[in-house]
Amino acid sequence: MPRSLKKGPFVDMHLLKKVRAGNESKDRNMIKTWSRRSMIIPEMLGHTIAVHDGRRHIPVFITESMVGHKLGEFAPTRTYRGHVKDDRKARRR
């Protein structure tokens, strides 16, 4: 269920401080974060945020179409390797 409009978007304060500091200094260095729950706001446009996927940080470049989504949506946590095409063990039974 989406968040109430009267509350506004949730962004972790430590992440918001880093984004605002980058905007003030016109510095676009990569920001490393573990906050997958933070919503992408217009202030983040043009930044590259490295989102943790449980094992490593995935760099995500923020574009206009991403505003309103959560950071975790762009760093998948599970690796799908596909189904086995020719499984000889299953065929024998």
From Swiss-Prot:
What UniProt keywords are attached to this protein's entry?
Ribonucleoprotein, Ribosomal protein, RNA-binding, rRNA-binding
MF terms in GO = rRNA binding; structural constituent of ribosome
Against InterPro entries, the record matches this protein to:
Ribosomal_uS19, Ribosomal_uS19_bac-type, Ribosomal_uS19_CS, Ribosomal_uS19_SF
Question: What are the boundaries of the signal sequence?
Answer: none
Any single Pfam family the record assigns to this protein? Ribosomal_S19
Q: List the disulfide bonds.
A: none
Check the record and name the PANTHER family matching this protein: RIBOSOMAL PROTEIN S19P FAMILY MEMBER, SMALL RIBOSOMAL SUBUNIT PROTEIN US19M
Q: What does this protein do?
A: Protein S19 forms a complex with S13 that binds strongly to the 16S ribosomal RNA.
What is the protein name stated in its UniProt record?
A: Small ribosomal subunit protein uS19
What is the species listed in this Swiss-Prot or TrEMBL entry?
Answer: Tropheryma whipplei (strain Twist)
